[in-house]
């Protein structure tokens, strides 16, 4: 029994570590590539299109050429009414989020991302997937106050960058709500590869119009450096992040992944001040962010409590570990790309770059059931 527990814990910590490294790495890498002070590729839409094109190409190879994953049954109606709107808001959230790197620091961006639960709750109420509640509203108010305090303490506050980031947050929140409303309504489940196969190309097309208007003229008149290996490794990291999130979802519970997400944010804030010396954190920044995080933690606690109350009694710890061990033994600890991912219920979590259907810190789902769900 002790061996089984240790094996499960070690694997869990390894997956969490991979997730934290990749998630932080993609954000810092994007900042480095886009920043005029470093690699100097100030074209966020172009960078996002490279990510989407690469992800779609890899997904196409895995599904159509190497037959690693079986394609899902996709009708024109589902594609037009579900995939297209989700892709539109996904593309918007990445576009606005990456553009924010040109104007504000990574540390301040992470602090603003604490608004994600507020944005998602508002969108969920507007779309009718959630109901206004006093306890949740008080937490949202606490988060908002914390972000305002943190913004007030920002030395290099930039209104343009802040607007871009907040707009991206609300676009991502609407994308999460649409994912729940549209895909769950159609009974469609997608694994990480099939989600990229359908959503990445569509997002690429949506980004083409603003790219043609805003960035193509700039590329024609200015000397933009293009290093193949830089962009290839950047896109590869973004793609790997998708799979790491999938592995973390399968190995950990909702509470664990939330704690990992909060830890990642603090690590990212600290790392960004070291890697990018121009990023300055004030006491007011930290105070405001701490207040906002208190609201986020309380909100997550309420959501987990609600889910536990609505679910049947969970298995005892020994039984659960035994089941996990049997599942691990059966799969020989190999990743099965045909496993589908249950679309999480919306709850307001910070998104990670390039994760079209899976949130980085799940709102309030339990353990995702892997292995026996057909893609």
UniProtKB/Swiss-Prot annotation:
Taking the record's annotation, the residue ranges forming a coiled coil are none
Offer a single GO CC term for the protein. membrane
Q: How does it sit in the membrane?
A: Multi-pass membrane protein
Which stretch is the leader sequence? Answer: none
Q: Where are the transmembrane segments?
A: 9-29, 43-63, 76-96, 106-126, 140-160, 163-183, 193-213, 229-249, 257-276, 280-302
The primary location reported for this protein is membrane
- Which residues lie within the region annotated Disordered? 328-348
- Tell me the keywords, alphabetical order: Membrane, Sugar transport, Transmembrane, Transmembrane helix, Transport
Task: Report if keyword Transmembrane helix is assigned.
Answer: yes
What is its subcellular localisation?
A: Membrane
Indicate yes or no for the key word Ribosomal protein. no
Family membership: Belongs to the TPT transporter family. TPT (TC 2.A.7.9) subfamily.
User: What protein name applies here?
Assistant: Probable sugar phosphate/phosphate translocator At3g17430
What species is given as this protein's source?
A: Arabidopsis thaliana (Mouse-ear cress)
Q: What taxonomic lineage is listed for the species of origin?
A: Eukaryota, Viridiplantae, Streptophyta, Embryophyta, Tracheophyta
């Amino acid at each position: 029994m002790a061996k089984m527990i240790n094996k499960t814990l070690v694997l869990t910590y390894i997956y969490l570590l991979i997730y934290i490294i990749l998630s932080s790495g993609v954000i810092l890498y994007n900042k480095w590539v886009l920043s005029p002070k470093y690699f100097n590729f100030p074209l966020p839409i172009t960078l996002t299109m490279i990510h989407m094109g690469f992800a779609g190409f890899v997904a196409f190879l895995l599904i159509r050429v190497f037959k690693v994953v079986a394609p899902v049954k996709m009708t024109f109606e589902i594609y037009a009414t579900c995939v297209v709107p989700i892709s539109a808001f996904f593309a918007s959230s990445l576009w606005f989020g990456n553009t924010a790197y040109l104007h504000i620091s990574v540390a301040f961006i992470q602090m603003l991302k604490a608004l994600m639960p507020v944005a998602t709750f508002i969108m969920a109420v507007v779309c009718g997937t959630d109901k206004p509640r006093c306890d949740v509203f008080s937490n949202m108010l606490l988060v908002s106050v914390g972000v305002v305090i943190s913004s007030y303490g920002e030395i290099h506050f930039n209104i343009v960058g802040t607007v871009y980031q907040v707009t991206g947050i609300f676009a991502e929140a609407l994308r999460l709500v649409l994912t729940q409303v549209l895909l769950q309504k159609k009974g469609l489940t997608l694994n990480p590869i099939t989600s990229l196969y359908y959503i990445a190309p569509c997002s690429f097309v949506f980004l083409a119009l603003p790219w043609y208007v805003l960035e193509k003229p700039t590329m024609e008149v200015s000397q933009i450096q293009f290093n193949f290996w830089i962009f290839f490794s950047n896109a590869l990291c973004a793609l790997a992040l998708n799979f790491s999130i999938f592995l973390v979802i399968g190995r950990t519970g909702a509470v664990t992944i939330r704690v990992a997400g909060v830890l990642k944010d603090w690590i990212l804030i600290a790392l960004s001040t070291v890697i990018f010396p121009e990023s300055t954190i004030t006491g007011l920044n930290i105070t405001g962010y701490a207040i906002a995080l208190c609201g986020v933690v309380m909100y997550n606690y309420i959501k987990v409590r609600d889910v536990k109350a609505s679910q049947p009694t969970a298995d005892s710890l020994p039984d659960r570990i035994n089941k996990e061990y049997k599942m691990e033994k059966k799969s020989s600890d190999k990743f099965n790309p045909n496993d589908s991912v249950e679309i999480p219920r919306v709850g307001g979590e910070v998104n990670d770059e390039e994760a079209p259907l899976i949130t980085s810190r799940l709102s309030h789902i339990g353990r995702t059931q892997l292995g026996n769900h057909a893609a």
